[in-house]
């Protein structure tokens, strides 16, 4: 009996042709990224995450990580990680619903709810392996075709991807524009309304108007989901986060936090009313269909919470606050445009990709790792250096950064002076000479 190939396969090109076509397409795409100065390159750390590291075989001062409290190499966390591995082994062995949920995970969830759940009368926490997975869960499990999501234009990519997967209607409001958001809410008759916002925006460092967001959510019967990835551990009393810093409480709140930044370990969590969390356990695909994080990680996070909430955490936050104010001042000494940020994220907007990469390379030559952030992470024309501060930094580190930034800024000024005006660069040589002569005559007159 002769079998006929499925119709979906009959139109495929000859063997190997499809693979070759794909490789050609990808190679052209990579070449375009190179031409635009947009290819990203990984650097390899040879030592623990800290202010002073060895990266790609060189000693550097790092201003790239999100280790805001300098806990990633803290002896107490390292010891707790080792203890957790001895007690629970190296892996969880399964998903949370199929054998992988350990006592370490359960204990951590209780601790997180008590630590950062003060905004709710009945808080419960759910631990995830990554912040990306936590945001996907919040967006997809709690919405659907019946819902409308109102999303800040500068929300993190993980929120945006979760929104796309949710199948909900989407309304994007201009960044932090509460009047625009109010108008969208007024016009909506959706059965379920979900307002979604970062607290600290990761590329600008500014903080969302949280009190106004809560008020709008309550006025319109909406839920408010806040992603406090860059605020948890740093903002508020004892580092309890952005909601605690603003003294906000509401039954309409859902709080997402991450544990690989200020907490110095890994993972993320969602805190909400216990009914919301129980529903997420039943319906959040990014929670259900993945192996649970190693219990040793959760055990180390429990140790981190003790440091964050204690006197040492207060001292680290105070030092970080002083570093932030000093950095704000030194960034204003360059030719570029600092963003008005009062958080550990201190961006310096340069503009073009080429100029931003040149500044990054200039700093790198001085042993300073300050990453260049380019599209699509930020809008075209706003490429920037992102100075990320840690309590592990010293004021001597900032003095080195200041000197190197001033040199990079002056170098850009010299390069600009050496180039002809933009209007002349595309002219042929004879036209350029004639136009330049005319310009000189006009100036002399």
UniProtKB/Swiss-Prot annotation:
GO biological process: biotin biosynthetic process
Name of the featured protein: 8-amino-7-oxononanoate synthase
Cofactor list: pyridoxal 5'-phosphate
Keywords: Biotin biosynthesis, Pyridoxal phosphate, Transferase
Assembly with partners or alone: Homodimer.
EC number in record: 2.3.1.47
Residue sites binding pyridoxal 5'-phosphate per the record: 131-132, 202, 230, 258
MF GO annotations: 8-amino-7-oxononanoate synthase activity; pyridoxal phosphate binding
Ubl conjugation found in the keyword field: no
Pathway given in the UniProt record: Cofactor biosynthesis; biotin biosynthesis
Spans traversing the lipid bilayer: none
Record-linked Pfam families: Aminotran_1_2
């Amino acid at each position: 009996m002769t079998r006929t190939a499925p119709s979906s396969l009959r139109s495929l090109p000859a063997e190997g042709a499809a693979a070759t076509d794909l490789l050609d397409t990808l190679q052209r795409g990579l070449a375009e990224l190179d031409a635009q100065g947009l290819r990203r390159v990984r650097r390899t750390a040879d030592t623990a995450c800290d202010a002073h590291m060895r990266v790609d075989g060189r000693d550097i001062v790092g201003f790239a990580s999100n280790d805001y409290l300098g806990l990633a190499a803290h002896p107490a966390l390292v010891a707790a990680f080792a203890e957790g591995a001895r007690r629970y082994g190296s892996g969880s062995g399964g998903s949370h619903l199929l054998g992988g949920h350990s006592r370490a995970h359960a204990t951590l969830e209780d601790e997180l709810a008590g630590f950062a759940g003060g905004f709710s009368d009945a808080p419960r926490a759910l631990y995830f392996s990554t912040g990306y997975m936590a945001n996907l869960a919040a967006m997809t499990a709690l919405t659907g075709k019946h819902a409308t999501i109102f999303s800040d234009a500068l929300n993190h990519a993980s929120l945006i991807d979760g929104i796309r997967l949710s199948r909900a209607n989407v309304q994007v409001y201009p960044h932090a524009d509460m009047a625009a958001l109010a108008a969208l809410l007024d016009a909506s008759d959706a059965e379920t309304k979900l307002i979604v916002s970062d607290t600290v925006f990761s590329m600008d460092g500014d903080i969302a108007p949280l009190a106004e967001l809560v008020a709008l959510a309550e006025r319109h019967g909406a839920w408010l989901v806040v992603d406090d990835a860059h605020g948890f551990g740093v903002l508020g009393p004892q580092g309890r986060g952005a909601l605690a810093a603003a003294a906000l409480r509401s039954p309409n709140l859902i709080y997402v936090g991450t544990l690989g930044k200020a907490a110095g370990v890994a993972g993320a969590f969602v805190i909400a009313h216990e009914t919301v969390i129980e529903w997420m356990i039943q319906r959040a695909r990014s929670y259900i269909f993945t192996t649970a994080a190693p219990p040793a990680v959760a055990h180390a996070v429990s140790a981190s919470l003790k440091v964050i909430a204690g006197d040492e955490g207060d001292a680290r936050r105070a030092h970080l606050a002083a570093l932030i104010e000093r950095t704000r001042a030194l960034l204003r000494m360059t030719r570029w445009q600092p963003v008005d940020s009062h958080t550990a994220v201190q961006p310096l907007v340069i503009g073009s990709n080429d100029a931003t990469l040149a500044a990054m390379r200039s700093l790198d030559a001085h042993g300073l790792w300050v990453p260049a952030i380019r599209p699509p992470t930020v809008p075209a024309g706003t490429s920037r250096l992102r100075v990320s501060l840690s309590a592990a930094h010293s004021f001597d580190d900032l003095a080195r950064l200041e000197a190197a930034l001033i040199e990079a800024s002056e170098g850009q000024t010299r390069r600009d002076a050496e180039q002809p005006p933009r209007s002349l660069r595309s002219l042929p040589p004879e036209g350029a000479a004639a136009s330049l002569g005319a310009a000189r005559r006009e100036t002399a007159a």
